């Protein structure tokens, strides 16, 4: 029998499973299950100050309990340290114009769909279950004055996000730094 293992970031207890999660299978022979792989979008800056959106894997999962007697689950500890958690609701037709993220931050849509467009022209639409890491603080204005990323709502109505800001410096030229 095939069992689906729910995998995702253990950042927020109400985080739904990403549509981009690859689940492990149990062959029924008491063999260890293969760890899952899930994905996030990384908005990062290169050494020329240009932002990019790259789809990145998370795949260093271990099967363990979060707290006994709970059953084991796949977890991948990505960050340990100070963080700030913010719930945001972007109004209908919200347009974020070109801007940088204020901090290195994970952004998790809970309701509705929004988009991020990097300076290189890559545009990604994200909805519930998708995960984004915003780290474009070290971008430089291009010829049109664009810096960071363009963001806005795709769907009608409000878009609800959970934002987890990390107390750490942004990197440069490190796409997919959380692996």
Q: What do the predicted segments below correspond to?
A:
Residues 120-138:
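Short acidic-glycine-tyrosine-enriched beta hairpin
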Residues 23-82, 176-179:
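A short, N-terminal "cap"/entry segment at the start of jelly-roll beta-barrel domains
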Residues 64, 139-151:
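Short, Lys/Arg- and Gly-enriched loop/turn segments at beta-strand edges
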Residues 7-18:
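Bacterial N-terminal signal peptides
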Residues 1-3:
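N-terminal secretory signal peptides that target proteins for export/translocation
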Residues 89-90, 100-116:
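Short, conserved beta-strand element in jelly-roll/cupin
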Residues 58-61, 68-71, 83-101, 126, ...:
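Conserved short histidine dyad/triad with adjacent acidic residue
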Residues 133, 146-170:
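A short hydrophobic beta-strand segment most commonly corresponding to one strand
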């Amino acid at each position: 029998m095939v069992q689906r293992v729910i995998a995702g970031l253990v950042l927020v207890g109400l985080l739904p499973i990403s549509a981009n999660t690859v689940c492990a299978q149990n062959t029924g022979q008491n063999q260890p299950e293969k760890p899952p792989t899930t994905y996030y979008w990384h908005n990062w800056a290169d050494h020329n100050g240009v932002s990019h959106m790259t789809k990145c894997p998370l795949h260093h999962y271990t099967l363990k309990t979060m707290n006994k007697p709970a059953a084991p689950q796949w977890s991948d500890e990505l960050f340990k340290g100070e963080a700030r958690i913010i719930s945001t609701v972007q109004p209908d037709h919200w347009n974020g114009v070109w801007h940088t993220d204020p901090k290195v931050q994970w952004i998790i849509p809970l309701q509705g769909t929004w988009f991020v467009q990097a300076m290189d022209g890559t545009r990604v639409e994200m909805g519930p279950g998708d995960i984004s890491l915003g780290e474009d603080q070290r971008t430089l204005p291009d010829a049109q004055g664009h810096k960071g990323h363009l963001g806005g709502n795709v769907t009608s109505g409000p878009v609800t996000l959970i934002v987890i800001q990390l107390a750490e410096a942004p990197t440069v030229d490190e796409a997919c730094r959380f692996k």
